[in-house]
């Protein structure tokens, strides 16, 4: 039983390490990049431009997957949007 729990824990850790960062890309104001009138393909392009692998429109903001480690993404704790 302990072995199964250890295996599952290792697999979850591998997913976190391999999966990369994900979140909302920043616009020039430090806010989430909006997709109020955008589409999934527009957000996917924006995400790739911001060094992510892919993304989609999670209305009203773009959401990206697999950012590089040095990418800046929106964080609720350090939000400086229009401040």
UniProtKB/Swiss-Prot annotation:
Matching Pfam families: Toxin_3
Record comment regarding domains: Has the structural arrangement of an alpha-helix connected to antiparallel beta-sheets by disulfide bonds (CS-alpha/beta).
Residue pairs linked by disulfide bridges in the UniProt entry: 31-81, 35-57, 43-62, 47-64
Biological role: Beta toxins bind voltage-independently at site-4 of sodium channels (Nav) and shift the voltage of activation toward more negative potentials thereby affecting sodium channel activation and promoting spontaneous and repetitive firing.
Residue intervals of the LCN-type CS-alpha/beta domain: 21-82
Entry's family note: Belongs to the long (4 C-C) scorpion toxin superfamily. Sodium channel inhibitor family. Beta subfamily.
Full protein name: Toxin To15
Tissues expressed in: Expressed by the venom gland.
Signal sequence segment: 1-19
The keyword Disulfide bond appears for this protein: yes
Chief location category: secreted
Keywords, ordered alphabetically: Disulfide bond, Ion channel impairing toxin, Neurotoxin, Secreted, Signal, Toxin, Voltage-gated sodium channel impairing toxin
Cellular component terms per the entry's GO annotation: extracellular region
Cellular localisation: Secreted
Keyword Secreted annotated: yes
GO MF annotations in UniProt: sodium channel inhibitor activity; toxin activity
């Amino acid at each position: 039983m302990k072995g199964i729990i250890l295996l599952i824990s290792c697999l979850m850790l591998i997913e976190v390490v391999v999966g990369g960062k994900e979140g909302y890309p920043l616009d020039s104001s430090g806010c989430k990049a909006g997709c109020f009138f955008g589409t999934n393909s527009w957000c996917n392009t924006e995400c790739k431009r911001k060094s992510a692998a892919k993304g989609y429109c999670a209305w009203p903001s773009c959401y990206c997957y697999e950012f590089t480690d040095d990418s800046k993404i929106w964080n609720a704790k350090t939000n400086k949007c229009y401040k």
